[in-house]
Amino acid sequence: MQTLGAPAAERLDRVLARADAYRLLAAAFRDPDGPLPGDLETDALIDAVEALGVTVAPSEREAVRPIEDRPARAHEHRAIFGHTVAHGCPPYETEYGRRHIFGQAQELADIGGFYGAFGLRPANDGERLDHISCELEFLAIVALKEAYAVARGHDDAATISRDAAGAFLRDHPGRWLPALAGQVGRSAPHTGFAVLASLAARVADVHAAELGMVPDHLGPDDIRPIEDEPDGFVFTCGVDDADPAIPG
């Protein structure tokens, strides 16, 4: 590995902080009762998001602490997100802003295309591809690939990762995370998940701005839940079981 100058080293630190923020947020949003539960590492998460310039208020820290305990987090997760996409705060992108079921199918296919371009495959028993945890985990992996390229002075590879992250943010999480944050904040104010949803939206916003992207934000009133999955489009996700090999 080559010795990095100060600007490259600072950039590497920021990219790694972003990877940590996305990874820790993704883990926090996994269903605590599901087959791939994650942990909530509050201190590490706060350190990562604040390294990106996102301020975490004392009241937000206090709201998140109680759900570090998995049973408590599972209880709050069930209360807010429920077990169906038709619940009032669905953590799925395609329940927001679409006009018809075919639009959902197209959005899922587009999300899957981003994942596939980075060698990621759905895991058995995981979440649907448009779940917040899947989208955040994808951004974490893309950030790690960018960090790998920066550390080795591979500018072209770093640019590929940045461009992919920018396009994904513009078309997907950068658009709908503000809607989820608004919906959870309205339905369950002062809860740990209201804070986590807000942090996810703010981290994505800062990232998009750095990349020169201006996503067309959706709001909580743009939710359009449906009861059934479109035929042939029942997806799951969980990149823990994938093998996103980083090229040497």
Regions inferred by a protein language model and the residue ranges of each:
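Surface/interface-facing alpha-helical segments and adjacent flexible terminal/loop regions used
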Residues: 1-248
